[in-house]
């Protein structure tokens, strides 16, 4: 493992239509495709893969084929199945990308990707939270992680925010 490994972590690709997929292709992804400094670690995109139109998943995921590394994902609030209940809120996401939360080892790092979107809350709203099942999984995952690994926690909605500390949202 490298002492100076570099990982690409990006958020909010958030394409709303095929034109925006094209802008992402000719912009950020073309720029990233010319870099190789993160190839030993890969890329992690931390939510809002698309901007509510889940039919754009294949087009947006195809962009990551331009990278010189593997790409992994976690969901954000714009990746929701808005017509689903809480249990099925990320069914389409899971069909396209796999589990909504997961972990993996790369070099000196153990990277934990969390699903931090609670939906629905009060009708059609969302909140930032981690449910009890995921918290139990997280504890077990950390317990299994060798002590010499650097642990990186990634989530779409921040796990703690000073700006929302007095409210019930994003807690």
Outline where the language-model segments fall:
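Active-site-proximal beta-strand elements of phosphoester/diester hydrolases
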Residues: 4-17, 108-120, 152-156
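Sequence/structural signature of outer-membrane beta-barrel proteins
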Residues: 160-162
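Active-site neighborhood of phospho(di)ester-bond hydrolases with catalytic His/Asp-centered motifs
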Residues: 9-11, 42-48, 71-77, 152-156, ...
């Amino acid at each position: 493992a490298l002492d100076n490994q570099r990982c690409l972590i990006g958020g909010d690709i958030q394409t709303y239509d095929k034109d925006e997929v094209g802008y992402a292709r000719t912009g950020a992804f073309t720029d990233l495709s010319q870099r190789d400094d993160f190839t030993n670690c890969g890329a992690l995109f931390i939510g809002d893969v698309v901007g509510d139109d889940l039919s754009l998943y294949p087009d947006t995921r195809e962009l990551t084929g331009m990278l010189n590394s593997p790409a992994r994902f976690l969901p954000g609030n714009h990746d929701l199945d808005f017509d689903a209940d809480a249990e099925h809120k990320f069914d389409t996401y899971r069909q396209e990308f796999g589990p909504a939360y997961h972990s993996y080892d790369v070099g000196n790092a153990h990277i934990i990707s969390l699903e931090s979107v609670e939906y629905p809350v009060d009708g059609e709203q969302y909140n930032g939270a981690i449910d009890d099942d995921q918290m139990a999984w997280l504890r077990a995952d950390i317990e299994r992680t060798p002590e010499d690994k650097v642990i990186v926690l990634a989530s779409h909605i921040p796990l703690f925010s000073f700006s929302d500390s007095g409210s019930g949202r994003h807690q």
